[in-house]
Amino acid sequence: LPTASLYRLPEGRSFAEGASLLLTYGTTIHALLDRGHLAEGQTLLVLGAAGGVGLAAVELGKAFGARVVAAVSSEEKAEAARQAGADDTIVYARAPFDKDQSKALAEQFKEAGGKGGYDVIYDPVGGDYAEPALRSIGWEGRYLVVGFPAGIPKLPLNLTLLKSCDVCGVFWGAFAARD
């Protein structure tokens, strides 16, 4: 292997952790900085915040100076997100949602996001969680589509016009191969 392809394992990390660090943290750095333009003092919503890229987004969001709201599916996962640095947590119900449940989740997201909404939403989950999250985005916010294990999201694009926001796909592997 060329030396340029090697990375030093961070102190305190096992080889098993090291094997996943490049993918999870590389994806997340690309998402938050290159695609989401996250800046100090902004508000970040992380869906699936206890998964690999979700926890990376919580940790990196805090390191970049953002207020981080972590959305997860259980109290145990909320505790993991808090341990990673989340300022606030939301425990959401499991999908699928009916219309009332979707509205209720959007209200939870909005309440936690505050008056201005979220500057950046990091979504590695998709499915029924995407629309309620998009409804909580702030003016000119950035919605990052990182994955969709809960299903391909269906978003009403009129929301992007009403919020003057961006929806960005994040595919770090293709980005890294092209650059």
Where are these regions (language model features)?
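Glycine-rich phosphate-binding loop and adjacent beta-alpha segment
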Residues: V72, A81, D128-D179
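Glycine-rich NAD(P) Rossmann-fold beta1-alpha1 loop
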Residues: Y25-G26, G48-V58, G127
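Adenosine-nucleotide cofactor-binding segment
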Residues: V46, K62-Y129
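Glycine-rich helix-loop-beta junction characteristic of Rossmann-like nucleotide cofactor-binding loops
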Residues: D34-L38, A112-K115, R135
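Short hydrophobic alpha-helical segments of the AMP-binding
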Residues: A57, G61, T160
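NAD(P)H dinucleotide-binding glycine-rich loop of Rossmann-like/cofactor-binding domains
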Residues: L1-G48, P96-F97
